[in-house]
Amino acid sequence: MAQKLSNLANKSKVKFGSLYGSPIVWIVADKNHAGYPSNSVTLVTNQIIKMLCFDATEPSNGNSDRRGYGNNRYIYSNLRQWLNSPAAAGQWYTAQHSADQTPDSSHVWNGVNPYSSLAGFLNAFTANERAALLNTTITVGKSST
């Protein structure tokens, strides 16, 4: 029987959204999590659902680490864009800065798990499922050096 997420106990499992035609199983991680919108429920997937790089290598970046490993800033990450996009296959990516690069087979480690041609993560979610998601501001640390 369907229930409101807010009525479920922490660690309860729920099916919400889908990936490759299969429902995604989530665990209720917390309710009214500090720093998140009021009356919100935080979900985390029950298991790893996809292994993707955080960001593609950026060969034209002036920072040698970012040339070889991609950008470590969440705001610029390919993964952030993909996870938050309902766009069709190959349409979710937009360059976030002048050296940004798509996560295609030439710019991910050993060509493993490129995802530039995939649909956005939210693409297979229903309109009602997407409407139930809350916008959240993620605060991350940035080195002062």
Task: Spell out what each predicted region is.
Residues 1-145:
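Collagenous Gly-X-Y triple-helix signature in extracellular proteins
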